[in-house]
Curated annotation (Swiss-Prot):
Function of the molecule: Endonuclease which induces a single-strand cut at or near ori. May act by forming a covalent link to the 5'side of the nick.
Residues at the catalytic site: 450 (o-(5'-phospho-dna)-tyrosine intermediate), 454 (o-(5'-phospho-dna)-tyrosine intermediate)
Pfam family of the protein (one): Phage_GPA
Full protein name: Replication gene A protein
GO molecular-function term, one example from the UniProt record: endonuclease activity
Keyword Hydrolase attached: yes
A biological process from GO: DNA replication
Keywords: Covalent protein-DNA linkage, DNA replication, Early protein, Endonuclease, Hydrolase, Nuclease, Viral DNA replication
EC number(s) given by UniProt: 3.1.-.-
Family membership: Belongs to the phage GPA family.
InterPro entries (UniProt xref): Replication_gene_A-like
Amino acid sequence: MAVKASGRFVPPSAFAAGTGKMFTGAYAWNAPREAVGRERPLTRDEMRQMQGVLSTINRLPYFLRSLFTSRYDYIRRNKSPVHGFYFLTSTFQRRLWPRIERVNQRHEMNTDASLLFLAERDHYARLPGMNDKELKKFAARISSQLFMMYEELSDAWVDAHGEKESLFTDEAQAHLYGHVAGAARAFNISPLYWKKYRKGQMTTRQAYSAIARLFNDEWWTHQLKGQRMRWHETLLIAVGEVNKDRSPYASKHAIRDVRARRQANLEFLKSCDLENRETGERIDLISKVMGSISNPEIRRMELMNTIAGIERYAAAEGDVGMFITLTAPSKYHPTRQVGKGESKTVQLNHGWNDEAFNPKDAQRYLCHIWSLMRTAFKDNDLQVYGLRVVEPHHDGTPHWHMMLFCNPRQRNQIIEIMRRYALKEDGDERGAARNRFQAKHLNQGGAAGYIAKYISKNIDGYALDGQLDNDTGRPLKDTAAAVTAWASTWRIPQFKTVGLPTMGAYRELRKLPRGVSIADEFDERVEAARAAADSGDFALYISAQGGANVPRDCQTVRVARSPSDEVNEYEEEVERVVGIYAPHLGARHIHITRTTDWRIVPKVPVVEPLTLKSGIAAPRSPVNNCGKLTGGDTSLPAPTPSEHAAAVLNLVDDGVIEWNEPEVVRALRGALKYDMRTPNRQQRNGSPLKPHEIAPSARLTRSERLQITRIRVDLAQNGIRPQRWELEALARGATVNYDGKKFTYPVADEWPGFSTVMEWT
C-alpha cells in the first residue's frame, strides 16, 4: 500500500567542502594520466614562416643567435614544435626583432656623412660580433684608405695652387681636415677639433694632430673596440638580457669582460716598476697604485670624508640639505615593472622601441637638464653645492642621487626650478610626477649616513652585509661588481662634486711634508688650506679655499701644470701636474710637489746563481768537502740549457774535460735548440730540400709605425711628399734618395742577423 506524502520532504545532506586536491583513488595507479593523443603538426604555411624566422636568426651575431636557437630547441624538445613555432613568431619576430632592428639602425654606418666607405658597410654591420683579429684588420683598412685620400687631396691642392709650400697653411690644412675627418664620421665618431673646424677656427697644428690620429691603426682599433662593446651591450639590453630577472645593471658578458680587462691591467702593473730617471732607483708600481685613489677602498674613504666635510661646512654656514633623485622619462627605459612587492614582474617597454636609447643617451639627457637647472640658478642668483652620485636602474638606465645644500630661504625656489625642468619632457606621462623627480629634506647630521649606502654600492659594497637592493632584491654587497662593470662599459663617471673647490688641489696639498708650513713661501691663506688638507678636514679646506661656489680663478690654491719634455705619438705637448700655485700671488709663483721624474719600466728579471747540476761523483782526493745536501727545504734552481752550456765551456777552457766527450756535445746541442727562435707557419720555408731559415716579419712593428709619423713631418718640412712604401722603407732603416739628397733614420734592429740597411733612389 503506497504511503502518500503529506507535503514534507527530507532535506538533502550538507555539501562537503572540497579539499583542493584531485581525487586519486585508494592506490597510486588510480591517479589520472595525461590524455593520449597526437600533437597537431605544423601546416605548410607555418613551416615556411618558421624557416623564414630561423633564417633571420641565423644572420644575427653568434652571441644573439646562440641565445635564440638554444631557447627554441629547448621549447621544441620539452613542449612541442607548435610551441616552438609560437616562440619564433610571437616572442621573437613580433616583440624582439623590431627592437634589434632599431638598435642596428642607430649604430649602422652614417652614409649621410660620407660615401667613401660604402663598400665597408656590410662589414661594419658585423662589428658587434667581430673578434679582435678581424677588428684590427678592419681598423688598418680604414686608416690606409684615409691616408690615400689625404695624399690625393694634397696632390690636388698642389696642382691648384702651384707650390708645395701652400700645403703648410691654415687654409690648406683645414681643407684637407674637412674632407678626411668628414669621411671618418661615417663610422659614428667625432674627430678631434671637429667643432673648431665647423666654427672656422682650425689651425695647422690642430689639423695635423687630428689627422695623425685618423692615420693611426691603434687609434682606430681603440675606437672600434669601444663601439663594439656598447653596440653589443645595447643589443643584449634590447632582447631583455639586462634586468633584475636575468642580469641586473650589466650583462654577464660585460661583467666578465670588465673583470678580464682589470685582471690583465693588474698583471701588467705587477710586471712593471717605477724608475727614477736621474738616479735609476726603482720601486714597485703596484704598491703605488694600490696606495692611491685607484684602490676602491681608498676612493671610498676619500668620498666619505668629503661628504662629512661638506655636511660640517653646511652646518657652520647655516645651510639646509636636500636629497634629490632625478630619473629619465620612460622612453629611455627598455623595460618596466608590473605588480607590487614580491609579485613584481619585468616586461618589455614598447615605448623604448621607437628610439632604442642606451644608458649613454639617458646620461646625456640628465646632463642636459642639469645644465638648464644651473643656468636657471644663475639667472635667479641661487647657489647650491654638494655631491652627485650616478647609479643604474636594474635595466641599466642611469638615474642621479644628489645631496645638495643651500640657503634655507632659497630651498623652495630651487626645488620648484628643478621639478619644472625634470618634468619638461614627457611630464604628463603616467607616474612622471611621482618617479621622475623626488626631493627630501635632510636632517642635520644625517646626510652622510643617507648617501653612504649609494657610495658603497657603487664602489666595493663595504658595510652592506645583510642589506638588499631595492631594484633587484639581491644583496647590495653582490651588486657592486655589476655596477662598476656598468660604469666602465658606458664610460659614465659615478661621482662628481657640485660647487666645491677642486679635489686636485686638495690631493696635491696632501703630498706636501706633514706639519711643514709654507706660509713663508706663500701667505697665511695658502697655509690654512695646506693645514686643512694635511689634517683631512674637508670643511676647513672649503673655507680656506674661499667657500662654496667660488670661481676657480678666485680660489686660494690651484694645481700648477707645465708642458712635459716629451711629446706624444702625435707630436703634441703633454701637460703634467708639477705642483700648486696661488692665483692671488701670481701664476708664476709655483711650489713643486712632484720633484722626482719617474717613468714606467718593465721589471728586471731575477737571475738565479749559476749552478751546474750533476750527480755525486767519486772525489779526486781522500777528503770530500762537497757533501750532498741533507735535510731542510732548500732546493737548488734548475739551470737553463744556456747556463749549463756556459758552465761546460768554462770546464773545457780549464782543461777539466775534453771537447769530444759526450756530455759536452749534449750540453752544446741543448743550448743551441733552446736559443733557436721558433718560426711560425708563415715564416717557414716550404721547400723540403732547403734549410728552414727564419725570415723577418713583413709587418711594421709598433716603433716603426710611430716612426712613420715623425718621418712624414720631417720630410714635409723639406718640401717632400713621400709615398706610403717610401715611408715604410725609411721606418725600417732604409736610405732614400730625393733629388740627390739622402734621407735615413735610425731604427732598432729587432731581427738580429738580418740587414735592414737598404738604399733606394
